[in-house]
From Swiss-Prot:
GO cellular component: nucleus; protein-containing complex; ribonucleoprotein complex
PANTHER family hit by this protein: ZINC FINGER CCCH DOMAIN-CONTAINING PROTEIN 18
Region (Disordered) residue spans: 1-218, 275-295, 387-921
UniProt protein name: Zinc finger CCCH domain-containing protein 18
Pfam family, one: zf-CCCH_4
Gene name tied to this protein: Zc3h18
Subcellular location: Nucleus
Species this protein is from: Rattus norvegicus (Rat)
Keyword Acetylation in annotation: yes
Compositionally biased intervals (Basic and acidic residues): 73-85, 105-119, 160-185, 203-212, 391-479, 505-515, 656-665, 755-769, 819-836
Keywords on record: Acetylation, Coiled coil, Isopeptide bond, Metal-binding, Nucleus, Phosphoprotein, Ubl conjugation, Zinc, Zinc-finger
Length: 947
């Protein structure tokens, strides 16, 4: 019983080897087990001989086992060696074989029990323990070979144990009867013999259990139909005496029905779930009631182990897949199975399922589930219920069906996922294509805009010059600047008066919805100072909402040129207001939008500039709360009401109509905000970020927010939004749509960049007011558009309102935004016309841009020099401070920005115009940021330019 063999052989040798054994092996097994059991049986009769022969037999066994260990293949030889050893000993050898078998069985039993109970039995067999099943199997095979050869020669051959010397191999055959008799006697005595194997007293219990543990090989002769021993045959007659020493529930009957006895232990075993034997084990041992104690001990032990294993299986079954192999009747169980083919059958049965399930990993969940029920039924209930083989198979079929269903479902899911991925990829490709198209369109637009801008600038310059000539009063300050000042001054007047007359020209320019491009070119065409001055103001406004103003520029283009110039200056103030409101809105968050609406409405009354300052005060307070546009978005709504309240309160100052509008807008927005919130992540977020787009420069989020929001809106609408934006751009003659669309796409791209670049862009805008003014000039291109844009900006300085323009973009926002925009436009236009504060704001904006615009601010200020003075005085300092801080602050956080805004606003609060200037500065910075961002975004993405 060399240790080396057993561990490997244990799992297989008793159960698998025997089943796998060739007929000769089976014969040997049957012989060996008959010899083994016979030996056990004979042991009682032949204990004396066993004692005498046991020394020899054990020596032989050990030698045989060693040989077997060295050469499992030599098992046949070993069996022959046993036979030879028996042969030389004659019948004594046979008896010795029996003794050996008893000893070996004892050794095996002990070894098996040792394997199970190494603690209890740690003897010579401990070494053999790991091997014991295998050596047992091998020895059994060897002895079986000998015994079965004996049986083949004569099943009774060993029967003549009394004639140790006389019995020859040939004699063994005649002694089958004696053997059978002894077996019959020994059937009861097997346990006795096992118990009698007191030499291995350790294993008395072991011996019975171990022998029983060793599945008896199926009787080859019975399989052939030859076995004369009948029920007494030591070897398993599959249907008949399978039950082991203790007959199972109904000894032969359950098994034969389950599997034909010839089918062998496995079919039979499945028939009797091993649990069944437990019942019988506990029940009086089979007819050969060996000392009931031993049988009972076996039964109890067996039952305990079964229970343990059942509980283990229960515990492990969730993991059953992993532990299945250990859980399924393991080697230990097999040893039990050796006794109870039932166990073996379970092994065969469960392993089949196990194998199948292993092949079908997806079936596992079901399989484990099934197996769990299966085990409970078989193992736990088997104490009471005996499964017929059919049930497991039904379960198995069900399991297979479930597995198939599961597999199908998983395949379907996989297919769906693949389809989704494909769709995503397609969408992405389409988006990319659209972006490319948009870029191309943008390029075309920009080209057209440049051309138109050049034309418009020329026309505007001429017009502005004419207007300036006509408006010498306005031109007086601008005149020193000559073209530019006139244009700037003209712009304020234009805002007032030219808006009507030049609107026609703007209408012409309107044809150039890409007036933005013109405005950029106008930016380029600094020579076109007039438009440039406007543009700068607008730039603050438009740059605040570069995309808005760009959109508005196209819109404003639709407005008459002079009107556009006016609207530009207005739009700057609006933008300032809208930026303020948008800032507030950004601060307030999605509601801020409503605020931006309301604030823009209240700004729409002339006092609105003051109101924005008031709001600015209020706003700065809310903004900190709203500190981050994004963070504010949620909290913002509450602050929004305060601001709304402030707005409302200020609104009365400017005009209750504004308040009414505000109320309407608020209502719309209030209605909408839910919608926005519905869009909420994108909607309110984008709303605030859009309004935040003005705030973009303001808050870190600023561009990032606007880009986020625009990205959100575009991403939230995702493809649809993108297409909406793109088409919205197309849809809204206002390129603002396109700029909007660009903004989302650009914003998306710019999000990461925007945060970093916000400050940079602000700086760039400050540095490149000319560059921004072009965009802002685009915004100026549509002064009214910019006003509208301003309203949109307020609504969603960023895309949202633009989206509203493009009703497609954010429909939720759109409805509110459009209504708000319309209201705001109307409000703004009148209030804008009324307001010259916009110039002051523009002056403020210009201060924001830098002192560069201060000149224009001064000129622009001419309409409202007071504001410009206050604003410029404060604004230049504050803007200068803010410009740098704002860009950093915008980088650092909208809160900080808003706080400086508050401080500045508070400082400027003394002068509402100062506040307006600070707000306008902020807005200008924001607008500039926006314009720069938009420009950068357009250049980078060139997506938005959808013509």
């Amino acid at each position: 019983m060399d240790v080396a063999e057993s561990p490997e052989l244990e799992p297989h040798s008793p159960d698998e080897e025997q089943p796998a054994l060739s007929d000769d092996d089976i014969l040997r097994e049957s012989g060996s087990e008959q010899d083994l059991d016979g030996a056990g049986e004979r042991a009682s009769d032949l204990e004396e001989e066993e004692n005498a022969t046991r020394v020899q037999s054990q020596e032989e066994i050990h030698s045989d086992e060693e040989d077997q260990a060295s050469e499992p293949k030599s098992q046949d030889q070993d069996s022959e060696a046993h036979e030879l050893s028996r042969g030389p000993a004659g019948s004594p050898c046979e008896e010795g074989d029996d003794a050996e078998e008893d000893g070996t069985s004892d050794l095996r039993d002990e070894a098996s029990s040792v394997t199970r109970e190494l603690d209890e039995h740690e003897l010579d067999y401990d070494e053999e323990v790991p091997e014991e099943p295998a050596p047992a199997a091998q020895e059994e095979e060897a002895e079986k070979a000998g015994a079965e050869e004996e049986e083949e020669k004569g099943e009774g051959a060993p029967g003549e144990e009394g004639k140790p010397d006389v019995q020859s191999v040939g004699e063994k055959e005649p002694t089958e009867a004696a053997k059978e008799k002894k077996k019959e006697d020994d059937d009861g005595e097997i346990d006795d013999g096992e118990i009698d194997d007191d030499d291995l007293e350790e294993g008395e219990v072991k011996d019975p259990s171990d022998r029983k543990v060793r599945p008896r090989p199926t009787c080859r002769f019975f399989m052939k139909g030859n076995c004369t021993w009948g029920m007494n045959c030591r070897f398993i007659h599959p249907g008949v005496n399978d039950k082991g020493n203790y007959s199972l529930i109904t000894k032969a009957e359950p098994f034969p029905p389950n599997g034909a006895p010839p089918l062998g232990p496995h079919p039979l075993m499945p028939a009797n779930p091993w649990g069944g034997p437990v019942v019988d084990e506990i029940l009086p041992p089979p007819p050969p009631e060996p000392p009931t104690e031993s049988a009972w001990e076996r039964g109890l032990r067996h039952a305990k182990e079964v229970l343990k294993k059942a509980t283990i299986r229960k515990e492990q079954e969730p993991d059953f897949e992993e532990k299945r192999f250990t859980v399924t009747i393991g080697e230990d169980d097999r040893e039990f199975d050796k006794e109870n083919e039932v166990f073996r059958d379970w092994n065969s049965r469960v392993p089949r399922d196990v194998r199948d399930t292993t092949l079908e990993p997806y079936a596992d969940p079901y399989y484990d589930y099934e197996i769990e029920r299966f085990w409970r039924g078989g193992q736990y209930e088997n104490f009471r219920v005996q499964y017929t083989e059919a049930e497991p198979y039904h379960n198995y079929r069900d399991r297979e069906r479930e597995r198939e269903r599961e597999n199908r479902q998983r395949e379907r899911e996989r297919d769906r996922e693949r389809d989704r991925e494909r769709e995503r990829r397609q969408r992405e490709r389409e988006r990319e294509r659209e972006r490319e198209r948009d870029k191309e369109r943008q390029r075309r637009k920009e080209e057209w805009e440049r051309e138109r801008a050049k034309r418009d600038e020329k026309d505007r310059q001429h017009r502005d010059r004419d207007r300036d000539k006509d408006r010498d009063k306005d031109k007086e300050k601008p005149k020193p600047r000559s073209p530019q000042p006139p244009s700037r001054q003209a712009e304020p007047p234009k805002k007032e008066t030219a808006s009507v007359g030049p609107q026609v020209k703007r209408a012409d320019e309107w044809k150039d919805p890409w007036r933005r491009s013109k405005s950029p070119k106008k930016k380029l065409g600094v020579s076109v100072s007039p438009s440039r001055a406007r543009r700068r103001r607008k730039t603050s406004a438009s740059s605040a909402s570069a995309s808005n103003s760009s959109r508005s520029s196209s819109r404003s283009s639709s407005y008459s040129g002079s009107g556009s110039s006016r609207s530009r200056s207005r739009s700057s103030s609006y933008s300032s207001y809208s930026s303020r409101s948008s800032r507030r809105s950004s601060f307030s968050g999605s509601r801020s939008r409503s605020r931006s609406f309301s604030s823009s409405p209240s700004p729409s009354p002339t006092p609105s500039p003051h109101r924005p300052p008031v709001r600015t005060k209020g706003e700065p307070a809310p903004p900190p709360g709203k500190a981050g546009e994004k963070s504010i978005k949620k909290p913002a709504p509450p602050p929004a009401p305060p601001q709304a309240t402030k707005t409302t309160a200020p609104a009365p100052e400017p005009a209750k109509p504004g308040d009414l509008r505000e109320a309407r807008r608020k209502e719309r927005q209030t209605r909408t905000p839910p919608r926005r919130r519905t869009l909420s992540g994108s909607g309110s977020g984008s709303g605030s970020s859009y309004s935040g787009s003005s705030s973009r420069s303001r808050s870190l989020s600023v561009s990032s927010v606007s880009s986020v929001s625009s990205a959100t809106s575009s991403s939230s609408s995702v493809h649809s939004v993108d297409s909406d934006d793109m088409y919205a751009d197309l849809a809204s003659p206002v390129s603002s749509a396109s700029s909007r669309s660009p903004t989302p796409a650009q914003t998306k791209k710019e999000r990461g960049k925007s945060k970093k670049e916000d400050g940079v862009r602000e700086e760039k805008r400050k540095r490149d007011p000319s560059a921004q003014p072009p965009k802002s000039s685009k915004a100026p291109a549509g002064g009214k558009a910019s006003q509208q844009a301003a309203a949109p900006q307020q609504a969603a300085p960023g895309q949202p309102q633009q989206g509203s323009f493009v009703a497609h973009k954010e429909i939720k926002l759109t409805l509110l935004n459009k209504a708000a925009e319309k209201g705001s436009r109307k409000r703004y236009e009148p209030s804008d016309k009324d307001r010259q504060s916009p110039p002051a704001k523009k002056a403020n904006l210009s201060p924001d841009r830098g002192s560069r615009d201060r000149k224009s601010g001064g000129r622009m200020g001419s309409p409202k020099p007071e504001r410009q003075r206050g604003q410029n005085a404060k604004a230049p300092a504050a803007p200068a401070d803010r410009k740098r801080p704002l860009s950093p602050q915008s980088k650092s956080s909208s809160k900080v920005t808003s706080v400086p805004g508050k401080a500045t606003d508070t400082a400027t609060a003394g002068t509402k115009s100062g506040k307006a200037s600070t707000l306008s500065r902020r807005e200008e910075l924001l607008k500039q940021l926006k314009a720069v961002e938009d420009a950068i975004a357009r250049k980078r993405a060139k997506i938005p330019g959808k013509v």
